[in-house]
Every structure is written in C-alpha cells, then in structure tokens.
C-alpha cells in the first residue's frame, strides 16, 4: 500500500493526494510489485532503491545514485518484540529516499 501527501506551504496543512508533484511525501508500507513499478515510473527512480528500503535485513547505510540524483538512507529504528512472554529489544530498518524534491 502507498499513500502520497502534499503540504500547502501557505496554510501548513498536509493532505493526502493522488497527484505526483514536487515536494510530495510518498509513504509505502508493504507495497505490491505493481505499486512499486507505478511509483518508480512516475518519479523516475530505479525499483532497487525501494526494494532495498523495504528489506527487513538491510543494515544502516547511505547510498547515492548520481545518475538520477537519488539518495537512500537506511536507518535502524529500535523496536520491542515479545518472545516467550519477554520483551526483546531489536531494530527494524526504515528507508528514506530523497528524489530531487520527493521523499519516499
């Protein structure tokens, strides 16, 4: 699933949008292959960057694609999981992709 958001800079109100435009935030959670393809075609990036960002085994890193001016940040975010009734502290990667003026 993915949703796009746009913020009106005059009112500072963020709303969901269906239009691909400069400055949008694109939030992707477990997107289908078709959704990944659609987003990549509309904003002009490689599918690999989104797939890296969605990989639960990715390590924290920064990757720069100079051909299309895209930057991928993978950060490890702390989470608490319950295993056998006990709290276990772990990390989960979150991917942030900067594409010119779009963020995924």
Predicted segments, located by residue:
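Peripheral, non-transmembrane regulatory/ligand-interaction domains of membrane transport proteins
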Residues: 1-104
């Amino acid at each position: 699933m993915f949703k796009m958001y746009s913020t009106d800079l005059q009112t500072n109100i963020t709303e969901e949008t269906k239009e691909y435009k400069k400055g949008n935030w694109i939030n992707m959670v477990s997107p289908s292959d078709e959704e990944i393809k659609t987003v990549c075609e509309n904003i002009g990036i490689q599918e690999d960057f989104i797939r890296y960002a969605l990989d639960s085994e990715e390590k924290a890193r920064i990757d720069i694609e100079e051909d299309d001016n895209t930057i991928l940040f993978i950060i490890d975010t702390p989470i608490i999981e319950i295993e056998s009734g006990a709290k276990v502290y772990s990390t989960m990667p979150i991917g942030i992709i900067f594409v010119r003026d779009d963020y995924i």
